[in-house]
Regions:
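Short helix-coil boundary/hinge micro-motifs
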Residues: 1-177, 185, 217-230
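Short metal-binding segments enriched for Cys and/or His
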Residues: 205-215
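Cys/His-rich microdomains that often coordinate metals
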Residues: 182-187, 205
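Cysteine-rich micro-motifs
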Residues: 192-202
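Cys/His/Pro-rich metal-binding microdomains
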Residues: 179, 184, 198
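Aromatic side chains
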Residues: 186-187, 196, 210-211
């Protein structure tokens, strides 16, 4: 799976469930760690890039969010709430995966109880409710989600709700911390042969192993040195 940025966001989007994509708004490259949610502009760019994912069926056949996204511009306060949710999710992911990556340390909420509080607070930010639509034949009944919040507020709660389902469902057992050199990303191991978050990390790891085999004792960058994503 190729590593890419979409529609103006600098953050990598790997086609993962949205809670994982949110976790991956912290990423690393040869210049160090980056945070797409460092300000409201970065959050707005990321929401624009993933807006289509909130449509009906876009997330594993789940209900769509009937609030236009990115409807409304997120402000500094909401950007902070997205960071709190993201850091909470990264903290829980680190606990679930027993994440050994030193470079990823400090990119998530280290205390599980605090991380859970962050997720629950985000769920309550703009509560969602179901709405039934019943189209005339040949249509079919459909469920959408509504919210009284703005688009960005509803997106925050939607992602938090999706994270609750992820951590309490089968995907939790497939959540992985990418072992690529210097990588700090997470992914869902949807295929038993998948080892890396992206082909970029897989290729880098293979090059590292090849180099080590042919240059015994060489000081090749390890998994916690700069240089994960280009």
């Amino acid at each position: 799976m190729a590593l890419r940025a979409v529609a103006g966001t600098a953050a990598p989007l790997l086609g993962e469930p949205l809670p994982v994509e949110l976790m991956n708004t912290v990423w690393a490259d040869r210049d160090g760690l980056h945070d797409e949610l460092r300000d409201a502009a970065g959050l707005a760019a990321w929401l624009q890039a993933v807006a289509g994912r909130f449509a009906a069926g876009a997330e594993g056949g789940g209900p769509g969010l009937a609030v236009a996204l990115p409807g409304g511009r997120p402000g500094r306060e909401l950007a902070g709430q997205f960071r709190e949710l993201r850091d909470g999710l990264r903290g829980l992911a680190a606990a679930v995966t027993a994440d050994p990556r030193a470079r990823a340390a400090g990119t998530g909420t280290p205390d599980v109880a605090a991380a859970v509080r962050a997720v629950n607070a985000a769920c309550a930010r703009a509560p969602l409710w179901s709405r039934l639509t019943w189209a005339s034949p040949p249509g079919a009944p459909a469920r959408t989600l509504r919210s009284a919040g703005t688009g960005p507020e509803a997106a925050l709660s939607w992602i938090a709700e999706a994270a609750v389902l992820m951590f309490t469902g089968p995907d939790a057992g497939q959540l992985r911390a990418c072992p690529g050199p210097g990588c700090v990303l997470y992914f869902i191991r949807a295929h038993p042969r998948r080892e890396w978050c992206s082909a970029v990390c897989g290729n880098r790891a293979r090059v590292a192993r090849h180099y080590q085999r042919h240059r015994p004792g060489a000081n090749w960058p390890g998994p916690d040195t700069p240089g994960s994503q280009d």
